[in-house]
UniProtKB/Swiss-Prot annotation:
InterPro entries: CcmF_C (IPR032523), CCMFC (IPR044955). This is Uncharacterized mitochondrial protein ymf2. It is found in: Mitochondrion. One of its GO terms (biological process) is cytochrome complex assembly. GO terms for cellular component: mitochondrion. It comes from Marchantia polymorpha (Common liverwort). Transmembrane segments: none annotated. Residues 184-195 have a biased composition (Polar residues). Residues 174-207 are annotated as: Disordered.
Length: 322
């Protein structure tokens, strides 16, 4: 057996804390809390009653309130509304921790990743969605030039799950390009030539690929950063992603990768493009990570519960300052 990865070890620690928090016996937790109580809470009931009566006879109202808070048990405290919200704060924090743990475990268990050399036009099955590398384009900036991958992420319909194999939509889809302000020349292999002049595949004056407008057989897309959501009559839902690999003029050996990310409430899709050639294919990585959104929600809820509990503690000790 090999060593555990850092993520698996982290999940194990989170599970241990989860069991320690929720599955310990009630008596054990009650005894632990009793050891941390203030010393004046262990007074005899008769002695506590005498202290309360004597404190009420004093004229200093602030001191009487503080003494009442210190003398009475927590379930009888009526000074301020924040003291009754302590169980609610605890539930928010523990609920956030549970959601965070669930997001970490499910995202690791349901993760789907493909890394390898892919020829143009090949189709990948990523769970219920399909991914196709439609083409490779070139982009030129002021200090760099880059190769830009053109990925299609779609969900096939239930009636025709193998849509590309049974009709002629795949060749048309692979060769389709944005038309507004575009001047594209293809050589039959599904990629455009080097952009020149004011009009090219990237739109007027070298506009970024993710901001390009619609396809000949589609309606106006919903444009977002790094990907474009489109509509198609044969697909239930599909979008395009444009990862880049940039090479800088100052140092040709230095290259950076721009990841295309698509995020929703349930799944995050990541697409990366590497080196390759049109004859052998291009190295690409497509990652599907579900339930990442729940990690953020759990972290926010746990932080909110901790802040509310801290505010309650500060309000509690403020009575002594007055």
């Amino acid at each position: 057996m090999g060593d555990f990865s850092y993520l698996e070890s982290f999940c194990g620690v989170l599970c241990f804390f989860f069991f320690c928090t929720f599955f310990l016996s009630f008596h054990h937790r009650r005894d632990s809390l009793a050891r941390h109580k203030f010393s004046f809470f262990v007074f005899h009931k008769q002695r506590r009653r005498e202290l309360i009566i004597s404190s009420l006879r004093r004229n200093n109202l602030n001191w009487s309130r503080c003494f009442l808070v210190r003398a009475l048990p927590s379930r009888l405290i009526t000074v301020g509304h924040d003291f009754r919200k302590a169980p609610v704060n605890m539930k928010i924090s523990h609920g956030g921790v549970c959601i965070f743990i669930m997001g970490v475990i499910l995202s690791n268990a349901k993760k789907i990743q493909f890394t390898g050399k892919t020829p143009l036009g090949s189709e990948l099955h990523i769970g219920k969605v399909r991914s196709t590398l439609r083409g490779i384009d070139q982009l030129h900036g002021p200090t760099f030039h880059s190769i830009c991958g053109n990925f299609i992420i779609y969900k096939p319909s239930l009636k025709t799950p193998f849509m590309f194999e049974h009709d002629g939509s795949r060749p048309a889809l692979l060769q389709s390009r944005p038309t507004e302000g575009a001047k594209v020349s293809t050589n039959g292999r599904g990629f455009s030539s080097r952009p020149t002049g004011e009009g090219n595949f990237f739109g007027p004056k070298g506009r970024r690929p993710e901001m390009a407008l619609g396809f000949p057989h589609t309606s106006l897309p919903l444009r977002k950063k790094g990907f474009t959501v489109l509509e198609h009559n044969s697909f239930s839902h599909w979008l395009t992603m444009f990862p880049e690999k940039r090479f800088y003029f100052s140092n040709q050996e230095t290259s950076t990768t721009k990841v295309a990310i698509h995020t929703n409430l349930f799944t995050d899709l990541y697409a990366l493009i590497g080196t390759g050639s049109f004859e052998t294919g291009w190295y690409m990585t497509v990652i599907k990570l579900p339930f990442i959104f729940y990690i953020w929600i759990g972290f926010i809820m746990a932080s909110l519960g901790g802040l509310l509990s801290l505010f309650r503690k500060l309000t509690f000790y403020r009575l002594d300052w007055n």
